[in-house]
Amino acid sequence: MSHLTDEARAPYRDAQSSIELGDNSLEAIVAANPARRTVLKNGLLGLSILPMLGALAACGDDDDSSSPTPTPTPTPTPTDSYAINFASVAANQNDTVTVPSGYTVDVLLKAGDSIEAGTPYSGSYPTPADAEKWAGGNHDGMEFFELSGTDANSGGLLAINFEYPDFNILMAGSYNAATATASQKALALSAVGIGVVEIAKGTDGKWAVKAGSRFNKRYTGNSSYKASGPASGLLSPTIKGMLNNCASGRTPWGTYLTCEESTDNYLDPTQPEENYGWVVEIDPYQELAVPTKRTALGRFDHENTAYMANSDHRVAIYMGHDGTPGCIYKFVCDRAYSASNRAANIDMLDHGTLYVARFNADGTGEWRAMVHGQNGLTVGASDPGNTSQSTTPLAPTPVDFNNQAEVLVNCISAARVAGGTVMDRPEWITVAPDNSAIFVTLTNNSGRRVTNPANPRVTNLHGHIIKFKEDGNSPLAMKFSWEIFLQAGDPKLAPGGANLVGDIKGDTFSSPDGIRIDPKGRLWVQTDHSVPGNSGVTGTTIDQAFGHNAMFHIDQTTKQSKRFLVGPLGCEITGLAYTPDLKTFFVNIQHPTGNWPVAGQQPRSSTIVVRRTDAQPVGN
């Protein structure tokens, strides 16, 4: 989540009556064994393909006085290596994107660039009609999709989330939803949602958007969407817009899942709240259904999705509630998907069971079904409140769940009632390619007052990463084992307290947010600490402690951290996609505040392309 959206939503949240979040945050666990750590075996530890060089030995006949001329050995083509060999870059506060020596960075798509045919940003404020065709603002999650008949390492589709407007290129002054005109609302809403662009690599190795492609399309806060699934009857028949599109994911059948990280429309509060806070399924190829809000996956502040599938094509979708605190969920489809018929999967996400994770003190966990009539989800239920952020016991709040639709619409409360564990702001989730591990970033929770094994720090300013393993590596499992993978922080912050130090080996960071395991099993983490931010030590800002937000590789065995990329002034690093050969990485730079990406112009959120200059895989 961008700190900008936190600020934008604050007045709206403050005006609402609130229920303190869940007593089931592991407070019952803390007495059991607060120092617990479980060591899980990892089946994807530093996978690499090493270069193989061969040599032929020429054998001559000892009785032959003349040695035959050996046949020349062709120079072997080096095998691509995916070992992590880049030289770590230093933490810094430069107003540029810093990458290791031997790498290059190009800007692919800036806020205000054209997606659909029209006039791009040129320094003047646009009309809503103009901005509807532009790339929106605050680029966030994204996915790369292959195109039939196109070499996927040289071209394809990129679907990109736009979380929040880059208001500096839209209008003069600040935006106030309470007093905004219809035109101002339309302008603000034009800059959120997603964009799909066809991209291609040129002969010079640089990537560009293919202008005029039939795939280039905007889906905005002004567009129309439908709802489907068990709670669709509680939503409007036609929904205006989606917004706060934070991170994202994909399905095995090639659709894009974009996540609404807000349960209200804070840019236009006249819209019904129930219409927002959903996972929206969009087909980037424009072959299947219209963009659809899938209510079976629950309504909360969604961050991203990540799927696990087995050999029988059964699939689970993992999700985190970006709240302080929030729960971790999975949705299990009730049938196998079709790998040969995309159209047969059109309603896969409407039928299945939503579960919430419960973390036990002994290193085990279980999935609690969020089904009406089960786990306390009935009329006369009791929401336990959140003693994790209060040392004073809270009175439970009565809540009624009359049917499954109400369970899904009121998912945040239902998860606590069902016994889900509330965590320190679960953001991105990633699943190992062989299903052997799942990682979740818990970005931070400065409000935590009671510790426990899964959330072990009071005033958790810097966050941590948790790892769990499904029984049998199965998406259908009802139990799992877990461990804390690492705690963010830095030893030089020890004067502010032990909870600021962390246990990172190598390059330190704060507030892990984006996380992704690439197809070769390499774990990448992106950070989102607020700027200037509180490091926990008086007189030291968070940028002074850690440098600008950055992207890291973390070895899953040694847990050694290496800083790969550092962003420009004021930005968050978010979003990661790549070509199949991993020679091109796409990364988003969100809300820069300095003089980037174009000197002398307004700062703009942008998608960048990171490549090696020798055309080898990124990371080597």
Identify the role of each PLM range.
Residues 32-38, 49-72:
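N-terminal twin-arginine translocation
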Residues 1-38, 49-52:
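N-terminal secretory signal peptides
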